[in-house]
Amino acid sequence: MAAKQPPPLMKKHSQTDLVSRLKTRKILGVGGEDDDGEVHRSKISQVLGNEIKFAVREPLGLRVWQFVSAVLFSGIAIMALAFPDQLYDAVFDGAQVTSKTPIRLYGGALLSISLIMWNALYTAEKVIIRWTLLTEACYFSVQFLVVTATLAETGLASQGILLLLASRLLFVAISVYYYYQVGRKPKKV
């Protein structure tokens, strides 16, 4: 009895079997759109993601503002810790300091915030940058409200206090602007 020989193997060409390729890609989850509307060309790019999607498109001047903020917070913190009388005198024009402890505590808090600002300067993570900008905006807003309340209580309106209030409003506006700019969704390229 003669053994039956198997039929010759037929090679499939990918150009001729498009339906098979489509089914394979669908099973692998490749080629379709994800939630963000991106089309992945391979499973690897789908798993790893597209790094353009995660890169922060920084608004013009953001890093300069972060640097200025870090220097500002550090400088005022050191001045409040080392020279509390002079800092109080510069803001409130000759009003007598009753205790240096609250001013030094203020300096310690500012020094802590400045460390966060310095670390945020070197990160590329969008969430961290936004949180530090929000922290700045909240700090400057609270400082504006506290100084305004003190001004209303004491009635001492000096040029230093008015300059401080105007600068705090400007700093709030800049921080909020960058906060929203960093949070914007990037445009599709």
Swiss-Prot record:
In this entry, the parts of the chain located on the Cytoplasmic side of the membrane are 1-63, 130, 181-189
Q: What topology does it adopt in the membrane?
A: Multi-pass membrane protein
Protein keywords = Membrane, Phosphoprotein, Transmembrane, Transmembrane helix
User: In terms of domain of life, where is this protein from?
Assistant: Eukaryota
UniProt subcellular location: Membrane
Q: What residue intervals traverse the membrane?
A: 64-84, 109-129, 131-151, 160-180
Q: Which residues carry this modification: Phosphoserine?
A: 14
Which residues point to the Extracellular side?
A: 85-108, 152-159
Q: Name one Pfam family in it.
A: p53-inducible11
Recorded GO cellular component terms are: membrane
> Does Lipid metabolism appear among the keywords?
no
- The answer to keyword Transmembrane applying to this record is yes
Q: Write the protein's name.
A: Tumor protein p53-inducible protein 11
What is the originating organism of this protein?
A: Bos taurus
Q: According to the entry, what is the taxonomic lineage of the organism?
A: Eukaryota, Metazoa, Chordata, Craniata, Vertebrata
